């Protein structure tokens, strides 16, 4: 064996040993992000006894810029940029995200190594005044940072006033309790994961409020070239959840959507069949125009399904709504 071949072989062995001995997980510092990273850490540790798994907690621009609407400062990519930099710089091996916070298209350097089994995808009403949105008094102020939620709220409940709210789950609850809002809308799964079930006044059904693409799913991101890391996290992947969120994200990608536009999408496996049904929505910010479309197909055609539903929405005039939103 030549010296060059020997050096390469030793390098590859060292890489395998390094991966086998430890893995570092990049995560945001918010309580919910830490919960998700700890969840992934526990799963990896369970599957790989003896492997050292540690968190690399980071602050992101999205966590720091709390005085402006996300739609006006660059969208939810602000929550992942620092974590991706940690992967590229070698400070972390994987990054854990809420899938709904990730852009539809990743940089060529990265891939989704796993989508964990999805949790509750629905939104929740949190208020100290009523158990339902319809029972809130006219003019009641409802807080949300999501244009998707704003659009659907105003369409179904025009008697309400919707205002921007930023911060992590506990910060938003504090603002509600402090009287700045009469109610707020949050993802049910976030409250459940933080053992805040008691704060949920009512869970909003899929028919009441269609979720964001990927809502409720935890994503594990890694570098495309890290084959050993991809093999390590592959057992965390849930096949059906992966197909469903692929269909949802495909709709959003077809519409060039991100958190700066009111797009909703939710796919689920049809009971007793080998098909997933996909529902999607595009709405104006003031809720005066809501477009809906749906279709179904086998899981392996998830991306094609999403493209078809996206085309249906475009045929209904979604491009006009989205161009109007972009000008605001």
Language model: regions and residue ranges:
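Short, Asp-centered acidic motifs that coordinate Mg2+ and/or phosphate
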Residues: 93-94, 183
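Extracytoplasmic loops/domains of multi-pass membrane proteins
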Residues: 85-86, 97, 102-107
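Short, structured active-site "lid" loops
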Residues: 69-91
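A conserved helix-loop-strand patch within extracytoplasmic ligand-binding domains
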Residues: 99-100, 108-160
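Short, Lys/Arg-enriched N-terminal segments with co-localized hydrophobic residues
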Residues: 7-18
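Small-molecule-sensing regulatory modules
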Residues: 20-65, 72, 80, 99, ...
